[in-house]
Amino acid sequence: MLDVLRWTTARFEKHGLASPRLDAELLAAHAFAMSRIELYAHFDRPLSASELASYRDLVSRRLAGEPVAYLLGHKEFWSLDLLVDSRVLIPRPDSETLLEEALDRVAGSGAGLRIADVGTGSGALALALAKERPEAQVFATDISPDALAMARANAERLGLAVSFLEGDLNQPLGPAGRFDLIVANLPYIPSADIDGLAADVRSEPRLALDGGADGLALMRRLVAAAPELLQPAGCLALEVGADQAGAVEELLRGAGLGDIRCRRDLAGIERVVSGVKGTSS
């Protein structure tokens, strides 16, 4: 077992993967139906031919650029175990920063709270918000029917109540009324930068990555619509790319939102911008 892990780690290091040992352990645990701790507790357990074949297949796919989360079929986000595959963007810790800001913004809200997650993908944000605020009505939109199928599967598996709506950005929210909180982790990578991304990131849906010429195309549209979507004192909170926070702040101000705030992620990057309807800057 240890020899297998050492061999795989060396292969992954040579290939330039960011977390070679962790990737090797996660794939081995999956292939051998063990926890990572059990890999070391039973390091001398012989491996069957079928186990080794399964593991080699996972290693080959990882070396070809397939993300670990897709190989495992799930990813943890906010202590929720979410199903993921190539239909959806893989939830990232950066988006937990968006969730923290969103929860802070509605901390004093009571019954009747209405929340929308625009561009939900796997459903990560909507489901985490439904978990943290079970009294709220939570809606989630996505233009991709494949992504919505995955989000619905996650909601059913976790037993969380979210209303999923198919359509472009906020378009399907019209009949749902106005909201106290809108969150969105929209594509924010400039189109010209997509081909230069790491292979595993390029394996994710381009629809979930490509934010147009400057990365802000979809955010501009949502921000422009926000005043009609938000309740008085309602909040819009957006995840943004590195160096985009200032531009997004100006978009929110231009739409008449105030109480603009930026929140940094664990790496110190300004990752979230939020603003409130009907307040001065």
What are these model-predicted stretches?
Residues 1-20:
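Non-catalytic nucleic-acid substrate-recognition regions in nucleic-acid-modifying enzymes
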Residues 12, 106, 155, 226, ...:
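Conserved hydrophobic residues forming the short capping helix/wall of the S-adenosyl-L-methionine
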Residues 21, 26-105:
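Conserved AdoMet
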Residues 27, 65, 95, 125, ...:
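Residue-level signal for inorganic ion chemistry
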Residues 97-200:
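Conserved SAM/SAH cofactor-binding pocket of Class I
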Residues 141-148, 199-231, 235, 241-243:
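Glycine-rich S-adenosyl-L-methionine
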Residues 242-255:
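Short alpha-helix
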Residues 253-281:
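Core SAM-dependent methyltransferase catalytic element
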